A protein has these predicted regions:
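Inter-motif core of Ras-like GTPase G domains
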Residues: 89-111
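P-loop/Walker-type NTP enzyme "switch/lid" segment
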Residues: 3-13, 20-94, 145-151, 179-180, ...
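Structural beta-sheet core signal
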Residues: 35, 83, 105, 133-135
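P-loop NTP-binding site
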Residues: 216-241
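Anionic-ligand binding region
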Residues: 112-137, 141-159
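Beta-strand-loop-alpha "switch" segments that mediate conformational coupling across diverse proteins
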Residues: 139, 153-184
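Inter-lobe coupling/hinge region of RecA-like P-loop helicase motors
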Residues: 176-195, 199
Length: 241
């Protein structure tokens, strides 16, 4: 069994949206996925608890219980445990990262979200975990051209220390429509743009965790880490040291 921790150090980034949609996408692709809601806000539970299959696939938990839950899920035959992590305190975020095979930091293309992504990356790298960053709630391209804010976010995150997923999730009303019905975007419109993005993101994450046709996860800038003149992540994002 593999474990994915979906992280954000600030509210509003869409961490729960990503976690829930990835879990339901996995199940749609015949991966036996379960979700652990370790966020005290219990947003994932609010969305999913009315589903017929919620029992056995959705768990309310806390950071201190994640290791035991992971062991129980593995014994039950699950293929994938997705953790909707708390935003704080840092110790709880770290506990979630420790039990994960891969940490997925969620960030919108905004100054404060990028700053929070740097803090998430710091925890992931300090613990020696594999990780990546996904940009969420991005404005869609116009006439095939990415909005400047999205381009700048991708450029800034090149220096954050972890790779950025090639698929960004766009700001679309269907996410809220789906949540209001306790469903995923794939269940609302399986042929829509949002569904395609979620499927692509899940396959990228799943292949990364299972080692399918991928080299070990490392930042494209790994070979620059020995160079003293490389800007720090906070400097690259225009943040104070």
């Amino acid at each position: 069994m593999k474990t994915l921790a979906v992280m954000s150090r600030k509210g509003g980034a869409g961490k729960t949206t990503v976690a829930v949609n990835l879990m339901l996408a996995a199940r749609a692709m015949k991966v036996k996925a379960v979700l652990a809601d370790a966020d005290p806000l219990r947003s994932a539970c609010e969305v999913l608890r009315g589903r017929d299959e919620a029992t056995g696939t959705l768990f309310e938990t806390s950071a201190s219980k994640l290791f035991a839950l992971k062991e129980a899920c593995a014994r039950s035959g699950a293929d994938l445990l997705i953790i909707d992590t708390p935003a704080a305190p840092e110790q709880d975020v770290a506990e979630a990262a420790k039990v994960a095979d891969l940490c997925l930091a969620v960030a919108r293309p905004t100054y404060l979200d990028l700053a929070a992504a740097v803090r998430s990356v710091a925890i992931i790298t300090q613990l020696g975990r594999d990780g990546m960053i996904v940009l969420n709630q991005c404005a869609p391209p116009r006439n095939g051209i990415e909005p400047p804010a999205v381009v700048k976010a991708f450029q800034a995150l090149r220096f954050a220390g972890l790779p950025v997923t090639p698929t960004a999730l766009r700001s679309r009303l269907i996410y809220q429509t789906a949540f209001a019905q306790g469903r995923s975007v794939l269940e609302i419109d399986q042929d829509g743009a949002a569904s395609a993005e979620v499927r692509e993101l899940f396959m990228h994450v799943w292949k990364s965790m299972t080692g399918q046709a991928r080299a070990p996860l490392r930042s494209a800038n790994d070979d620059l880490r020995r160079i003293d003149t490389r800007p720090s992540p906070r400097t690259a994002l225009g943040l104070r040291a």
